[in-house]
Amino acid sequence: MQFIDYNSQVFFFIRFFVILASILQKQYNFYIHLSIKQVVIPMHFKHINTRHIQRILLPLLAAGILASSAYCYASEGQGMLSPSSGNSDSVFGGNTSSESVTDEKLQVLLNQLQGQLPTGNGSWSVYVCDLFEKSEGSINDQSMQAASLIKLFIMGAVYENYDQLTGTYGKDSVDSSLYSMITVSDNDAANTLTNYLGGGNSTEGMETVNAFCQSHEYNNTHMGRMLLASNENDDNYTCVSDCGHLLKEIYAEEDSGYAHATDMYNLLKAQTRRNKIPAQLPDNVKVANKTGELDNVENDAGIIYDSENDLAIVFLSQNLSDVSAAENTIAALSKEIYEYYN
């Protein structure tokens, strides 16, 4: 369903009408005065050919109506495909509507991608951010199983408490656990760090991870169990936009809100699992990423960097019947996204 912002249309038309009045005043001494409670239109004519005015006024009024409608149409909502330029919660600054060329370009891409997502192999979410133009968009952005993508947020929480943790457990222990957790997706390392965050208590450690997510408005991300633990009572969840916004902060490095953004970036650059987003990209293309897998889940979140057009890309898929096909889908669509911008 599409919604029209009639307030925007009215104000656009008023601006057009004021400009029109100014033109008429200069050419014909035609005066229009507006008050808050009523509209008063006293007119003073000086050698005016009224037919001439009609020939000018009516087409201009029609043009104003068409222009205001076009303005409103350009601002319409896009349903589940949601491009935006900038984000008030991100390092990129304030909100901008989807009227820019960049967002139109992104909308075309999102439409293409949605048409290629599998319809018989699980549920899918996709996020794309043009890191140069600072525009982003998503398909089906909703809470889904995080698998090992929860480790991105464990990493964020650890670095936010880095000084305290290294003071208590030692820098070598914290750093080596971070490296193993991210580069080879070591579950034991993830559990060790979560325990560190809780002062030896895993429940409190998970609460610290969740507090980190809430404080940074990753509102659809939740750590409900330790890695390898049963998901009978709770599970780990995230969404593509939460992962994408964390990647944007990491990519920003010194301009980021995170003191250790460069350290996080370097860990992602050292990733050894390259079978999804990087798999079909040219050999010279650099990707910093983190994967996630369960029996019926295939996820990947990555930054394509040092390219003509750097990008952040996130794929989440769950309830899969064919995980191998899902890996190929992520690889193929990542290649399509890269080639679209580069």
Regions found by a protein language model. Give the residues of each.
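Conserved catalytic neighborhood of penicillin-recognizing serine enzymes
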Residues: Q164-V209, N219
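Active-site SXXK
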Residues: S143-G167, M181, I313
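Short, conserved catalytic-motif segment at the N-terminal edge
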Residues: T119-S143, D163
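Active-site-proximal beta-strand/loop segments in catalytic clefts of secreted hydrolases
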Residues: C129-L131, M181-D186, L193-L197, G224-L228, ...
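Mid-domain, small-residue-enriched loop/turn segments at the edges of structured enzyme/sensor domains
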Residues: T194-D255
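Short, Lys/Arg-enriched N-terminal segments with co-localized hydrophobic residues
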Residues: F13-P42
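A conserved catalytic-loop motif detector
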Residues: N233-E293
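Structured C-terminal helix/loop/strand segments within mature extracytoplasmic catalytic/sensor domains
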Residues: I19, V40, H44-T50, Q54-P59, ...
